[in-house]
Amino acid sequence: MMTENTKENITAVPEMKLELVPVPVSDVDRAKAFYVEKCGFKLEVDVQPTDTMRVVQFTPPGSACSIVFGTGMGDITAMQPGSVKGLHLVVGDIHEAREALIGRGVLVGEVEEHDQGVKYAAFSDPDGNIWTLQEMPWRSSEF
């Protein structure tokens, strides 16, 4: 028997915050250098609890969500390096963010403008994981 969803029988979902996104890489130290030195991400964790496991976690400037990569972490490190596409970094001024990354040695594509003034520019890490800078005019007050 199907039950109709009404406001009376739908349980509210509590607030959830995205905390950690795995990014598969082939060389942990090379990726660590890229994200810290080139992208300016904050190194949060770099631990090796066992001989076969290493966990490295970074947070983009101003973000509450971090990325993680390493070795010996089961399904996370079994992912194909370079297979993550379309991670978005929302910025207040895409031209400023793009120039800052270029100034640090990151190859960033040209800014493309789309509907409603949304702008995008993409770059990739050494393994080919693709990141997208995104500027949304209606969110400019957040920066």
Q: Model-derived features: where do they sit?
A:
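Short amphipathic alpha-helices within nucleic acid-binding modules
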Residues: 34, 95-100
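Vicinal oxygen chelate
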Residues: 1-16, 20, 44-47, 54-55, ...
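Helix-adjacent hinge/juxtasegments
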Residues: 79-83, 87-90
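Acidic di-acidic motifs
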Residues: 27, 93, 125
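Short, charged/polar, Gly/Pro-enriched secondary-structure boundary elements
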Residues: 62-67, 127-131
